[in-house]
Design a protein with these regions (language model features):
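Single-stranded RNA-binding regions, centering on S1/OB-family and related RNA-binding modules
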Residues: 1-144
Length: 144
C-alpha cells in the first residue's frame, strides 16, 4: 500500500527499539504489513504504549522514500484556535520582526512571529488566541 502525504493512517505499536546514535524509536506496523519507525523522544507526553494503536499523519515522504510520521496530538488539532499565555517578548531584529514566546500544554517553548502591522506586543502574562497551523515533532507551529 502506498502512503499519501497529508493523510492519516492507523498504526499498531509493536515495540520500542534503540538505534545506535539515533535513540529510542517506536516500531509501528500499518494494516498493510508495512513497518515504520517513529522517534520516541518528541512524543514522550503522548502516552504511546506497546500494543496500542495510534493515528499518524504522513507529514512528508522524501526523495529516497523515507516516510516521516506525526502522531495525532492529544490536545491540539490543526487549524483550531487555542489560548496561550505570553511568556516572553523579543526585541526587533535587523528586519524589524518581533516575536513572542508562549508555552504549549507540555511546556515546550514556541516562538510566534508578531506582525509589524499589529499593535504593540502583548504583555508578558497576557492570554492570546493563536491558531495551530501544524504540528512538528510534537510541537505546535502557531500563527496569529
Amino acid at each position: 500500500m502506498k502512503l499519501v502525504e497529508g493523510k492519516y493512517y492507523h498504526f499498531k505499536v509493536l515495540k520500542t527499539v534503540n538505534l545506535p546514535e539515533e535513540g529510542d524509536h517506536y516500531m509501528l506496523r500499518h494494516k498493510s504489513g508495512r513497518r515504520l519507525l517513529l522517534p520516541a523522544e518528541p512524543y514522550n507526553n503522548y502516552c504511546i504504549g506497546v500494543n496500542s494503536t495510534i493515528e499518524c499523519k504522513v507529514d512528508k515522504i522524501n526523495c529516497t522514500g523515507k516516510v516521516f510520521l506525526e502522531p495525532r496530538h492529544p490536545v491540539y488539532i490543526e487549524d483550531k484556535i487555542y489560548d496561550f499565555t505570553v511568556h516572553q517578548n523579543s526585541v526587533k531584529d535587523i528586519n524589524l520582526n518581533e516575536t513572542i514566546t508562549v508555552h504549549d500544554v507540555f511546556n515546550n517553548e514556541v516562538q510566534v512571529n508578531w506582525p509589524s502591522n499589529k499593535s504593540k506586543l502583548p504583555e508578558i502574562g497576557t492570554n492570546i488566541k493563536l491558531r495551530v497551523d501544524r504540528l512538528t515533532n510534537g510541537v505546535p507551529i502557531l500563527n496569529i
